[in-house]
Amino acid sequence: MTDEEYMQRALELAMRGAGWVNPNPLVGAVVVRDGRIIGEGWHPAFGELHAERQALADCRQRGEATEGATIYVTLEPCCHTGKTPPCTEALIEAGIARVVMGAPDPNPKVDGGGVAQLQAAGIEVVQGVLVEECQEINRAFFHYIETGKPYVILKYAMTLDGKIATRSGKSKWITGEEARKRVHADRQRYAAIMVGVNTVIKDDPLLTCRLDSFESSDVEELQVVDESDFEDLLEREMAEDEAAFEADLEGCADSTLRGFGTFKPRCSNPIRIICDTRLRTPLDSQVVRTAAEIPTYIATCERDLEKHLPYRERECDIIVVPEAAGHVDIEILMEKLGELGIDSVIVEGGAEINWSVLAYEVVSCVQAYVAPKIFGGAAAPSPVGGLGVEAPKYAIELSDPKVTQLGRDLLIECEVK
């Protein structure tokens, strides 16, 4: 196998941490000696061992010696002590002879320091193998490290004639099951989901990841859980999680370490953020009623603590932000979310909040799910409302699209320039 093939395997392993490592990066590692994989690992969750240490531990579990081996890792090994000890020390102590690296780590605590430490210890370091792929899986992490603000994805589903609902406001379902699986995989992967209060009032959504136990790296295996079953699922989770996880570990293959089994016991719900300028979120809404189980923030311009109290009693957190043009100041909100450690946000609101996040220039990526259907109707809403631009030359410019077919639907993804 080539360096690229081993790195591709490390990328697959890295994705198993999706939804669990935030605000840390996704990282995978593969240890190879004499053309044979002797250990594998990935960063399974925030605060747990990093991929390199997991892979070295896997080698020990298998009874394999690491002296003179090569390790393939998707991100530059860390060289500082945070929640866990530095990985560079572990690699040096393990006698690793060669480190093949994907992307450099822009974290100021690393930023080339990992490479320097390894080279100073006489370890050969090869950089830039599948670097674009390694950067792609951590685009949210890189953005957060460089700006201190969340990586924002604007997501919507529409018909081929650009409608997100019929003239009567009905929208279930525009896209098919494969597209909806992908949406929930992203809810698993990214830290938070944000909507406007009008969406809460109109649709009363749960804003959860409705995927049952699944392997994070394999979207094709995801199973959708009906929203109507979610409250029952929450109750079962409390009783079943520990037992289910232990059962998973008992059933792991010998080569899989206890503590980071192949399958996650339950899906990971995103943090929920409601933009609510005047604090109108209904107290009996599903997001408020389930705030004790799922972290829920309400961003508002309302400063009256008496009005905050009913929400706080139901375990919602209130974020007070300034008002701008009659709405929550989105730019200030993003700064506050960054301070809370939220590295990524999916915006799944209606036309007005979609325009707001675009107008404030906080969006990094646009995801448009397009179904081969036509709704028609002048009263049927489009994905982006607001004032809009005056002339084509003022359009918000996007990158060349990446197009993925999901069943009969298309996912069109563009970065905002």
What do these predicted ranges mean?
Residues 8, 12-15, 39, 50-53, ...:
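A broad detector of short, well-ordered amphipathic alpha-helices
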Residues 31, 36-133, 256, 297, ...:
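Zn2+-dependent cytidine deaminase-like catalytic core
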Residues 64-67, 94, 147, 188, ...:
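Structured loop/turn residues at beta-strand edges in well-structured enzyme cores
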Residues 115, 131-138, 180-187:
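Hydrophobic, well-ordered secondary-structure segments
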Residues 2-25, 83, 151-152, 158-417:
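Enzymes that bind and transform nitrogen-containing heteroaromatic metabolites
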Residues 28:
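Helix-turn-helix
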